[in-house]
Swiss-Prot record:
The lineage of its organism: Bacteria, Bacillati, Bacillota, Bacilli, Bacillales. Transmembrane segments: none annotated. GO terms for cellular component: cytosol. One of its GO terms (biological process) is translational termination. The gene is prfC. This is Peptide chain release factor 3. Residues 10-277 form the tr-type G domain.
Length: 522
């Protein structure tokens, strides 16, 4: 790989934004896009009433509800870096999509509501990042409202998440009393709601302002200085190495809604966020600077443009250089493909991409060739990157087309939406009736909404009373083993499994069939 290409790869910053719903993830995403010059104004998302929708929330149901249920991909340039943001679903029912997205990034930005601290979904997603060793940058949001005390939030970060924290800035007051941010890294105080030429006030060597200023009269100014002194003396030492290893999280305070502290965060993040990292494969570690092109499909999205009924496969480029029109091998099938139709995204806006490098996320128009987890490369034809996570569903519904004359629409819709991985498909063993499985109820609602809106197919769903899926070997697939509390079905790859009513039904099955091994997904 040439030095120019190495430099280009090193400039990539590919990260996901993770949070509990309503922590402000979408708002901060919009502010980042604002600084990247991609949009001219940021609108806040609160669903139907406002009529304003976030740039990253492009699907109709997201606009209606004000939540993210799919992962959007956005790209822009900032201070010499190419930024690739993946805005993940905030709703826990779509955690599988989020987990797959986290396989495609090099770092994560964790957004926390200052009033609520660490919430359930935040904790789940943090654990995945930690498990993968992904560096985590923390943005404590909504400082323009009353919330928990900053020292309390730091203690919660360290105790609940078990990670070292290092505050890069520190709030001077909060809520109505918010006066500014003490920036430990840039050695300035950033004033809240100030004129541009007075926004940043330089600090002296003693840690106080170089020149007297009205902000020093704030009730919370002296308190902030005392807390900074405490952090300097008793807090963690700053360590770039520990940040990159995912063992220390830099903490930024601010308000995405009022756009306070966001650009400072972005500027600092670009300095410290890692460049594209290596990826594990069946042929060893593939480094980003490997000259051979390779990448994996982490997401498939149908109907991003409903007028065209298209399907886009999102690929994380792991190594080398992509050029439009290049030939690659889809290693799962051994099939040779020409990558003639490729695109980059800003939510639902797209443009043709002619080249991209390791770290970039691109979309490939898919006519049915790809599956989530596929590897494509112009190198070794046997290369496969590590498997992407797949969750065992916990809710199951039989699904039918209400109008038997529209079976074609029904089957096409089910098949395409299942291929996206947001819902799983099973079929009854002999009659092959459709059963869909999900992690949470919202997935069924989104499925029904999209079937009606995108495929003109009204559906009927009926609970089947089964909640646990366990796979078996093909030689153990005997329909005679089904009972009132268990039923034999097959997944979309024709692998056999039993759906059980509860743990008691599983234990009963195991007692009766001790030689049959039951396995689950994640």
């Amino acid at each position: 790989m040439s030095q120019d290409l190495q430099k280009e790869v090193a400039s990539r910053k590919t990260f996901a934004i993770i949070s509990h719903p309503d922590a402000g993830k979408t708002t901060i995403t919009e502010q980042l896009l604002l600084f990247g010059g991609v949009i001219r104004s940021a609108g806040t998302v609160k669903g139907k009433k406002s009529g304003k929708f976030a740039t990253s929330d492009w699907m109709e149901i997201e606009k209606q509800r004000g939540i993210s249920v799919t992962s959007s991909v956005m790209q822009f340039d900032y201070n010499g870096s190419r930024i690739n943001i993946l805005d993940t679903p905030g709703h826990s029912d779509f955690s599988e999509d989020t987990y797959r997205t986290l396989m495609a990034v090099d770092s994560a930005v964790m957004v926390i509501d200052a009033a609520k601290g660490i919430e359930a979904q935040t904790l789940k997603l943090f654990k995945v990042c930690r498990m993968r060793g992904i560096p985590i940058f923390t943005f404590i949001n909504k400082m323009d409202r009353q919330g928990k005390m900053p020292l309390e939030l730091l203690a919660e970060l360290e105790e609940v998440l078990g990670i070292e924290s290092y505050p890069m800035n520190w709030p001077i007051g909060m809520g109505k009393e918010l006066a500014g941010l003490y920036d430990r890294y840039h050695r300035v105080i950033e004033q809240y709601r100030s004129e541009e030429d007075e926004r940043f006030l330089p600090l002296g060597e003693d840690g106080d302002l170089k020149e007297a200023h009205a902000i020093q009269k704030s009730l919370y100014y002296d308190q902030a200085l005392e807390e900074i002194m405490l952090l300097d003396e008793a807090g963690n030492d700053f360590s770039r190495e520990r940040i990159i290893a995912g063992e220390q999280t830099p903490v930024f305070f601010g308000s995405a809604l009022t756009n306070f502290g966001v650009e400072t965060f972005l500027r600092t993040f670009v300095d410290f966020a890692p460049a594209p990292s290596s990826h594990e494969s069946n042929e060893g570690v593939i480094e980003a600077d490997n000259p051979k092109f390779s990448g994996f499909i982490f997401k498939i999205q149908a109907n991003m443009n409903p007028a065209h009924r298209d399907r886009i496969a999102f690929i994380r480029i792991c190594s080398g250089e992509f050029e439009r029109g290049m030939n690659v091998t889809l290693t799962r099938t051994g099939k040779s493909l020409k990558l003639a139709n490729s695109t980059q995204f800003m939510a639902d806006d797209r443009e043709t991409v002619n080249r991209a490098v390791a770290g970039d996320i691109i979309g490939l128009y898919d006519t049915g060739n790809y599956q989530i987890g596929d590897t494509i490369t112009n190198g070794s034809k046997k290369l496969e990157f590590e498997k992407l996570p797949q969750f065992t569903p916990e809710l199951f519904m039989r699904v039918y087309a209400k109008n038997v004359m529209k079976q074609k629409h029904f089957h096409k819709g089910v098949e395409q939406l299942v291929q996206e991985g947001a819902i799983q498909l099973f079929k009854t063993w002999r009659t092959e009736e459709y059963i869909i499985g999900a992690v949470g109820q919202l997935q069924f609602e989104v499925f029904e909404h999209r079937m009606r809106g995108e495929y003109n197919s009204e559906i009927r769903m009926e609970p089947i009373g089964k909640k646990i899926a366990r796979w078996v070997k093909e030689e153990d697939a005997d329909e005679k083993l089904s009972t009132a509390r268990s039923m034999l079905v097959k997944d979309r790859f024709d692998q056999p499994l039993f759906l059980f009513e509860n743990e008691f039904a599983i234990n009963w099955f195991n007692d009766k069939n001790p030689d049959i091994e039951l396995t689950s997904l994640l």
